[in-house]
Amino acid sequence: MASVYENSYMIVLIFLLLGILLPVVALTLGRMLRPNKPSAAKATTYESGIEPFHDANIRFHARYYIFALLFVIFDVETLFLYPWAVAYDNLGLFALIEMLIFVVMLLVGLAYAWKKKVLQWL
């Protein structure tokens, strides 16, 4: 019985190694085989074929990052909720309570951000 588990983990390990090794090999080969002829035209920013008329380095307001982080947090929450919702019939009351605690913790964080006026734009 132990060999079945070891075989399963070996398959995961092989996929993990291939998932790391293949991109590294592809990027290394691409770097070695590409022509390296730097020029001033290649260093400029591309703006739909038009000559760039201002600097490409634009500063974003910090609030964009806060909204992006909040989006990522609640997006990951839905990733955790989906498998639970699919297998809800088999999990029982304990899993329901665990998921409610998880959702309440996220809602408390959202209420805290709302109270600190992080979600107000100006």
Curated annotation (Swiss-Prot):
Subcellular location: Cell membrane
EC number: 7.1.1.-
This protein's record includes keyword Transport: yes
TM segment ranges: 10-30, 66-86, 91-111
An example molecular function term from Gene Ontology annotations: NADH dehydrogenase (ubiquinone) activity
Substrates-to-products reaction catalysed: a quinone + NADH + 5 H(+)(in) = a quinol + NAD(+) + 4 H(+)(out)
Record-level GO cellular component terms: NADH dehydrogenase complex; plasma membrane
Class of the enzyme per the UniProt entry, highest EC level: translocase
Membrane topology summary: Multi-pass membrane protein
Record flagged with keyword Chaperone: no
UniProtKB keywords: Cell membrane, Membrane, NAD, Quinone, Translocase, Transmembrane, Transmembrane helix, Transport
Function, as annotated: NDH-1 shuttles electrons from NADH, via FMN and iron-sulfur (Fe-S) centers, to quinones in the respiratory chain. The immediate electron acceptor for the enzyme in this species is believed to be a menaquinone. Couples the redox reaction to proton translocation (for every two electrons transferred, four hydrogen ions are translocated across the cytoplasmic membrane), and thus conserves the redox energy in a proton gradient.
Subunit structure as annotated in this protein's UniProt entry: NDH-1 is composed of 14 different subunits. Subunits NuoA, H, J, K, L, M, N constitute the membrane sector of the complex.
HAMAP family: NDH1_NuoA (MF_01394)
PANTHER family xrefs: NADH-UBIQUINONE OXIDOREDUCTASE CHAIN 3 (PTHR11058:SF9)
Similarity-based family: Belongs to the complex I subunit 3 family.
Protein name in the entry: NADH-quinone oxidoreductase subunit A
Organism: Bacillus anthracis
Upper classification of the organism: Bacteria, Bacillati, Bacillota, Bacilli, Bacillales
The encoding gene: nuoA
